[in-house]
A protein has these predicted regions:
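A structural signal for multi-pass alpha-helical bundles of membrane permease subunits
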Residues: 22-306
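Short, Lys/Arg-rich, polar N-terminal cytosolic tail immediately upstream
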Residues: 1-21
Length: 306
């Protein structure tokens, strides 16, 4: 009897190890399709992008290794430098405005009745779920220099004397792009901030107000630390989206007038698929990826230290 019990105890670890091994193999098998997809459509293109950026790669001739020449040419290319400047302007203007406006709106609607909060969340989120092409076409009509609503309102209010070609004038085109980007990018941050503010411990806020804290002090000392992770996420996502601004440019201005709305993303597309200079376009892609990674790391460092 004792021998049987001992044998049973010895067999249990073996069965446990076999079961764990089977579960591990099954887990890897379930993971395999996603892993193959990730390697094939993310890792491989990234590696090839970096690799071909060191070549003079074109559709019309064989690839020629040129080392860092593409990168050197980038910083002597006036069109690229203009696109870099425009991209940075879009990021510097749109990211803070998006975050501040979204937090302000969320703070205003989070304390409304539940039905009102839900209604405003849907209203602000509509541009996100609506196709970007459809939204862009509507804005293009509104900015039309013949029958657009902005020219009609401007003349009726006495602000302008004649129609303005908003998207065809170098003075206004980039500002119009930023305005459209702002209206289409605040929906998700508002929804996220409403959720984050709704999860703030109100007992702490009430206790602070009882102790004499103002609403601003209560927000800064109690609410802000609790919504910091959400703010970090919004900062990073908004920054990436601003750097990757492409559809608006493609559909509204094609980089014009006179390259005044060129962005790095659009210039990559134009160089690779219009001029067929794949190596040069990939070099721009590498620079863009480095810029996004560095800025995201800085944002993460600053917000974490706060």
């Amino acid at each position: 009897m004792a021998h049987t019990a001992a044998a049973k105890k010895q067999s249990e670890p073996k069965m446990s190890r076999a079961l764990v091994r089977q579960e591990t193999i099954a887990g890897y098998l379930f993971l395999l399709p996603s892993l193959i997809f990730f390697i094939g459509f993310v890792i491989y293109p990234m590696v090839m992008c970096i690799f071909t950026s060191f070549f003079d790669s074109s559709m019309n001739r064989a690839d020629v290794f040129i080392g860092l020449q593409n990168y050197v040419e980038l910083f002597h290319d006036s069109v690229f430098l203009g696109a870099l400047r425009n991209t940075l302007i879009i990021v510097v203007v749109s990211v803070p405005i998006t975050c501040i406006f979204s937090l302000w709106v969320a703070s205003a609607i989070v304390n409304m009745p539940p039905w009102a909060t839900s209604l405003f969340r849907v209203i602000f989120y509509l541009p996100v779920v609506t196709g970007s092409v459809a939204v862009t076409v509507v804005w293009k009509w509104m900015f039309n220099n013949y029958y657009g609503i902005f020219n009609s309102l401007g003349k009726s209010m006495g602000l302008i004397d004649q129609n303005i070609n908003w998207l065809g004038d170098t003075r206004y085109a980039l500002a119009c792009i930023i305005l459209i980007l702002l209206t289409t990018s605040v929906g998700q941050p508002i929804v996220l901030y409403v959720s984050a503010l709704g999860n703030v411990d109100q007992s702490l806020v009430e206790a602070a107000e009882v102790d004499g804290a103002t609403k601003l002090q209560a927000f800064w000392k109690i609410k802000w630390p609790q919504i910091m992770p959400t703010t970090l996420y919004i900062l990073v996502i908004t920054t990436i989206n601003s750097f990757q601004c492409f559809a608006l440019i493609q559909l509204l201005t094609s980089g014009g007038p006179n390259h005044s709305t060129d962005t790095i993303m659009y210039y990559i597309y134009y160089t690779a698929f219009k001029l067929y200079r794949y190596g040069y376009g990939n070099a721009m892609g590498v620079i863009l990826a480095i810029m996004i990674a560095v800025l995201s790391a800085v944002q993460f460092k600053v917000t974490r230290s706060d």
